[in-house]
Amino acid sequence: MSLWFCPLTSTLNRQQPIHFIGVGGIGMSALALILVNRGHIVSGSDSRENTAVEQLRAQGVRVFRDQSAANIDAICSNVDLLPLVVISTAIPKSNPELKAAKLSQLKILHRSDLLAALIQAQPSIAVAGSHGKTTTSTLLTTLLATTDQDPTAVIGGVVPYYDSNGHVGKGRLLVAEADESDGSLVKFQATLGVITNLELDHTDHYANLDELINTMKRFGQGCRRLLANFDCPILKEHFDATAWWSVKTSAGVDFAALPICLNGDQTIADIYEQGKRMGQITLPMPGLHNLSNAMAAIAACRLEGLSFEDVQQGLADLQPPGRRFDFRGTWEGRQIVDDYAHHPSEVSATLTMARLIVTSGRSQLPNPPKRILAVFQPHRYSRTNKFLYDFARALGEADAVLLAPVYSAGENPIQGATSESLAKAIRIQHPNLPVAVAENFNQLTLLVQKHSLKGDLVLAMGAGNINNLWRQLTHLDNAKRCPPSLAA
């Protein structure tokens, strides 16, 4: 059952409790934070303990440590209005708490409907795309914050400026990350939509690229204005945008960032608007993909009326979100970095950036690394099956590769979609590249100890629980100084 309502304040009574099943999820926790900070009575449940849950409890949110029918009985007792229950696509119909909510005839709302209401209730910017949407929405939120716009933000990652994925601002704008994985972003009707790029992913939901294109078109058509990436061939061919940006050309686009210098610690570029040079920027982040993400954020700010000078000054405070080339600490001379890359294009972009850090000898890491040990955890059998050889090609950019078992994300195994199959594909494409496969997480830690060298960059990539690898290295030199990710 799904309920469409808008605006939020005209439908939700602050005296009506709102309960999130799976509140520790990165998208759910952001919404819960927004609502509790707007005076709503919020509760939730999650079988995982993470930083998101800790933050919610600190805000006074009651979070149950399991998901059971008893939780529904508890939240329905001694209330004047029956609770509204919020779920995400990750919650199966067999969930005992969801089944109890249905038996109690509670209204059940998908998180996308709640986010859609927030987006439509005020001027908003919704950032979508196959890759870079979390980084772009984080950079945009930070630029708006540092230029005294104080936006409300609902992001799928930790925004370092707020140390949170959700923030209630006093400014007029809301920034939201629009996730395409289940198609629910078609409900969002933003003042400005942003699409970073587009290519096939989430093959558990989309049978082919055309289905994904049609979904993203519906998202774009629902926005009052659309800002899109001119460098993406699919967007360029299939979409009619209000404005375009590029990091390759200033001709025929509204905004461009043309790189002058790409180093391992920063990027210097000239900014153009309508073909006119506006000035030079220094982005404190490496990688051409990050320059594109930053250009999208800059363009969105300019479309919302901010001066170029203000935006230019705000760039100095930019940081990527958590789990995006996230330095976690050191272990016996090895530097451990965690990254969310889980699609071949993301793996390639992350390794290209890592290689730039190695070759340039310049880095924001404590020490410039000498070699790249990629530790990759495939995410979902469906994605591994579809992109097996693309993953093999992308991982070839490392100096050595360790593979964790596939993180199922609730999917059933698919024959041939295994880490062993991926290792075989890597050996075929890159015969001289050292590759090893771990049978479990404990063995993965042993393989890191065995195959890594002093001076290595140990780059853990994946969207599952690979971000726990640094914890497994029990002798991490500065573990106490590196807090766990909110998405952990």
UniProtKB/Swiss-Prot annotation:
Keywords: ATP-binding, Cell cycle, Cell division, Cell shape, Cell wall biogenesis/degradation, Cytoplasm, Ligase, Nucleotide-binding, Peptidoglycan synthesis
Gene for this chain: murC
Family of the protein in this entry: Belongs to the MurCDEF family.
HAMAP family: MurC
The UniProt record lists the keyword Cell division: yes
GO cellular component terms given for this protein: cytoplasm
EC number, as in UniProt: 6.3.2.8
Pathway membership: Cell wall biogenesis; peptidoglycan biosynthesis
The protein's name in its UniProt record: UDP-N-acetylmuramate--L-alanine ligase
UniProt catalytic activity: UDP-N-acetyl-alpha-D-muramate + L-alanine + ATP = UDP-N-acetyl-alpha-D-muramoyl-L-alanine + ADP + phosphate + H(+)
Biological role stated in the UniProt entry: Cell wall formation.
PANTHER family per the UniProt record, alphabetical: UDP-N-ACETYLMURAMATE--L-ALANINE LIGASE (PTHR43445:SF3), UDP-N-ACETYLMURAMATE--L-ALANINE LIGASE-RELATED (PTHR43445)
Domain of life of the organism encoding this protein: Bacteria
InterPro entries listed in its UniProt record: Mur-like_cat_sf (IPR036565), Mur_ligase_C (IPR004101), Mur_ligase_C_dom_sf (IPR036615), Mur_ligase_cen (IPR013221), Mur_ligase_N (IPR000713), MurCDEF_pg_biosynth (IPR050061), UDP-N-AcMur_Ala_ligase_MurC (IPR005758)
Any one GO biological process: cell division
Any GO MF annotation of the entry: ATP binding
Species the sequence originates in: Prochlorococcus marinus (strain MIT 9313)
EC top class, as a word: ligase
Pfam family, one: Mur_ligase
Subcellular location as annotated: Cytoplasm
Binding-site list for ATP: G129, S130, H131, G132, K133, T134, T135
